[in-house]
Amino acid sequence: MEQIQVELGVRSYPIFIGQNLLENSDYFSSYLQGKKILIVTNDTIAPLYLAKVQALLASYQCADPVILPDGEQYKTLSQMDAIFTSLLAQNMGRDSVLIALGGGVIGDMTGFAAACYQRGVDFIQIPTTLLSQVDSSVGGKTAVNHPMGKNMIGAFYQPKMVAIDTACLHTLPAREFAAGMAEVIKYGIIWDGSFFSWLEQNVAALKSLDEAALTYAIAKCCQIKADVVAQDETEQGVRALLNLGHTFGHAIEAEMGYGVWLHGEAVAAGTVLAAQTASKMGLVDQSIVCRIEAIFEAFDLPTEAPEAMDFEQFIKHMRRDKKVLNGKLRLVLPKAIGQAEVYGEVSESLLQEVISRA
């Protein structure tokens, strides 16, 4: 079992990583004693893990769970209302704990509900997808989508702990696993070139769900994320680097319809577009772009924008990106494998050239 600490002063919290973590209630006891618990999950995860978690927490006060429909298209304010209704109907107060049992959508919605309910109650993340284990469950970003943009309504609100059971990945569909790998690869590109090289050398081990390889990769990603969040919790500086590929990627998700492209698929294509932009600007050699494309392809991820999207469809969403400052687009672009930077002087004509050739 690995343990990583997210250092945020009095709001610091642990990330536990290990196989069959959901068979040991000791990890949870100090966060649940004397609390009333509401588990929030979805209709895909509930048949797989809800009974297991309920059995794990049998000695605590558990309310009736909330089971939401599965999918990015349901990450909305109207669906989040079901969480609030359940909390109120079961007379749950400020001593409540919400448990997010699921992937990134469930984690984001549960965290946002916890931030809002009675002006803030505790919550715990139990991420069940690779993407949520390496990225969205750590760092306190919570949100729902709006038809005009992804994650536009939300808050920074940290969990009390994160419990990552690698055994959950054995029930994850291959497409979802690949989508999670997009975020894993991102860490290598922006932060750690040696980790990127390790990923290139361990494609087969990761795709076969080798336990040692998985644990190493997840722990490496969580440690990088914890270090970045400790430096810049609310994304005023270095944390923006974690958005590599996301400006293009969020545009793909919003334009194609939430859930048509998985988040990780959109990030993969978006990262290649970012790398091609960096190459056009003379920031990286074309050989770097080729390495980035090759590793995404090795994990069965898209490396091109949707044929159905043109420049105007991209740019209308990109102009709403949360990194826009004084009306100017700001893009995270790679400078090398293991290094990235935020650039605020990227011309739309250059972006049009990159997108048109994609």
Swiss-Prot record:
Pathway: Metabolic intermediate biosynthesis; chorismate biosynthesis; chorismate from D-erythrose 4-phosphate and phosphoenolpyruvate: step 2/7. GO terms for biological process: amino acid biosynthetic process; aromatic amino acid family biosynthetic process; chorismate biosynthetic process. Its EC number is 4.2.3.4. It catalyses: 7-phospho-2-dehydro-3-deoxy-D-arabino-heptonate = 3-dehydroquinate + phosphate. NAD(+) binds at residues 70-75, 104-108, 128-129, 141, 150, 168-171. Keywords: Amino-acid biosynthesis, Aromatic amino acid biosynthesis, Cobalt, Cytoplasm, Lyase, Metal-binding, NAD, Nucleotide-binding, Zinc. Zn(2+) binds at E183, H246, H263. It is an enzyme of class 4 (lyase). Its main location: cytoplasm. Disulfide bonds: none annotated. Binds 1 divalent metal cation per subunit. Can use either Co(2+) or Zn(2+). It is found in: Cytoplasm. One of its GO terms (cellular component) is cytoplasm. It holds the Pfam family DHQS_C. Catalyzes the conversion of 3-deoxy-D-arabino-heptulosonate 7-phosphate (DAHP) to dehydroquinate (DHQ). Belongs to the sugar phosphate cyclases superfamily. Dehydroquinate synthase family. This is 3-dehydroquinate synthase. It comes from Shewanella loihica (strain ATCC BAA-1088 / PV-4). The gene is aroB.
